Amino acid sequence: MAVGLGPLPTLHPVAGFELGIASAGIKRPGRKDVVVMRCAEGSTVAGVFTLNAFCAAPVILAKKRVQNAVRYLLTNTGNANAGTGEPGLAAAERTTAKLAELTGVDASQILPYSTGVIGEPLPVEKIEGALQAALDDLSENNWEAAATGIMTTDTLPKGASRQFQHDGVTITVTGISKGAGMIRPNMATMLGYIATDAKVSRDVLQNLMLDGANKSFNRITIDGDTSTNDCCMLIATGKAALPEINRAEGELFAKLKQAVFEVCMDVAQAIVRDGEGATKFVTVEVNGGGNHQECLDVGYTVAHSPLIKTALFASDPNWGRILAAVGRAGVPDLDVSKIDVFLGEVCIASRGARAATYTEAQGSAVMQQEEITIRIELGRGDCSETIWTTDLSHEYVKINAEYRT
């Protein structure tokens, strides 16, 4: 079940960015599993990619080509084309070469993306056979269909959109994402595509994508596994009648940054809310750190703990597991006598021990909720970080045990 995730909001079209969807039948006959995205000529494209050393063939190719004048993005689901060696790289090149042949652009202007089962050969002929249908389907109004087309174990499509005014001109930022398992992005299986009609220089766009990912996609985790295929792309078509943003300053940049960050946050949190088998959406706040890294270390140790995640699933306020996780997070010279821990607004541990006013009934009441905040005060400094995660349910085990059967 998706926690607090409803139907897609209105996804505003972005001038100069079109999406087309078709069926290649990679995993299931008739399923629409190929998505082609066309960027208007002159668009700038930025991206962040997985840091997994076993990165997939399409990631290798996309990283090489993202500096070029990108015109198309090609995504397939049902097959990750990862762990496939040189044949996998050749397969990714073949699919982009076919799309180049059909569109008249150079293959170096096409970025490939794949998601699905790792270690199986990419069905190149099936993908090639679906490309013309995807091209025929291209439309600026196809965001919702594309959000569905990139899904794998997701139960719901994920998207967000923002618009703002500047000098009488409306600027749009719209994005979609997919992911429900193998989620612990580190850039950043997860894919994200965000487009705007603002005109932005590539350097500014790349830094905007990095900052946006670090505050959203790189702060979510479901199971601690970093995918081989994670990518998040930001495209600026330049179709809005406003000057180019070539510096990270000024009112227009500030408005765009806020819109991009909000879209990133919405689609990143949607991945957590749709986590495989998730019944709880959990916010882990770590405050009072001596530096940001130790806040992240504590936050991720808590978020990844199987004992904490199963307690969350059982609605069991077993707060000792939280203390144990904080203690093993590797923070040097940690003074446990300064640590406070809260479940929601309920103080469960004060100065490293059970809070005098805490009762089991208070903790149980919080743990029964679908959305829970675990707040940890380290008492070491003024740095803070926030991680979003899920519980760990029987359904998560079932989904992943049966993934290939």
From Swiss-Prot:
One Pfam family this sequence matches: ArgJ
Keyword Acyltransferase: yes
InterPro entries to which the protein is assigned, alphabetical: Arg_biosynth_ArgJ, ArgJ-like_dom_sf, ArgJ_beta_C
Superkingdom, taxonomy of origin: Bacteria
Family the UniProt entry places it in: Belongs to the ArgJ family.
Record's subunit section: Heterotetramer of two alpha and two beta chains.
Protein name: Arginine biosynthesis bifunctional protein ArgJ
Organism annotation: Pseudomonas fluorescens (strain Pf0-1)
Originating gene: argJ
